[in-house]
């Protein structure tokens, strides 16, 4: 049976949601972040050399990286569900947003988190300098980039109910975490379509089932 090596408050929540949407049986092995470093525990390195989550094992197969995991699950268990037909405009949108989630949306969000943490982890004497540098990077670079990406997402959802058309797809599953992360840090602002989309996915029975099985998740 497929096993999800699940880290609390992490991208792996999306994998649980996808499996619930598809009705695929799975096991969960829970891992907890270190309370100080917020990093994954070393036990995960026994599953994959990088020791990060998400990672799944399915028989003798181990798959890491959320996008690769989503592709694997859709191909192995989807039976044509949650993916638009090949050659359609919806399929191109699906491919774009599936990769946008980690390729474009997440990096500035992670950098925002890191620059916010740096002043807490350096000597008090130079902490004001750390705050100044972090604030400048956030104001001049990261903040505008995140806003531009959220505006793009809002514009896309003005075209249709979901990111790849009128039906939920795995692209929406991938996009859930960056939108949730952005919302938790600075809110979605005056972006009604994006806000409505987030509320709608959170209300789905499969999403709620994944929350119950996954445990602590600060973004929903």
Locate the predicted segments by residue.
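GST-like domain detector, emphasizing the conserved glutathione-binding G-site
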Residues: 1-132
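Residue-level signal for nonpolar/aromatic packing positions in well-ordered secondary structure
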Residues: 19, 56, 69, 153, ...
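Conserved beta-strand edge residues that scaffold enzyme active sites
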Residues: 33-34, 171, 215-216
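Residue-level recognition of oxygen-bearing side chains
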Residues: 68, 193, 206
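Residues at helix-coil transition
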Residues: 74-78, 158, 202-203
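GST-like fold's C-terminal all-alpha helical module
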Residues: 101-200
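Terminal-tail/helix-coil boundary detector
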Residues: 207-220
């Amino acid at each position: 049976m497929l096993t999800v090596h699940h880290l609390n408050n992490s991208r792996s929540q999306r994998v649980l949601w996808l499996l619930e949407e598809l009705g695929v049986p799975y096991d969960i092995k829970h891992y907890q972040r270190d309370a100080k470093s917020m990093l994954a525990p070393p036990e995960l390195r026994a599953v994959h050399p990088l020791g990060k989550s998400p990672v799944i094992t399915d028989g003798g197969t181990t798959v890491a990286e959320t996008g690769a995991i989503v592709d694997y699950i859709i191909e192995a268990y989807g039976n044509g569900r949650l993916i638009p037909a090949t050659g359609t405009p919806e399929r191109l949108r699906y491919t774009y947003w599936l990769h946008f989630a980690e390729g474009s949306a997440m990096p500035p969000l992670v950098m925002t988190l890191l620059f916010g943490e740096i002043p807490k982890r350096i000597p008090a004497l130079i902490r004001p300098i750390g705050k100044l540098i972090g604030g400048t990077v956030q104001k001049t670079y990261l903040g505008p980039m995140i806003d531009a990406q959220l505006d793009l997402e809002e514009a896309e959802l003005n075209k249709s109910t979901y990111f790849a058309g009128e039906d939920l797809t795995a692209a929406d599953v991938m996009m859930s975490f960056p939108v949730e992360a952005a919302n938790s840090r600075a809110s979605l602002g005056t972006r009604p379509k994006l806000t409505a989309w987030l509320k709608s996915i959170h209300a789905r029975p499969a999403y709620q089932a994944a929350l119950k099985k996954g445990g602590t998740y600060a973004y929903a």
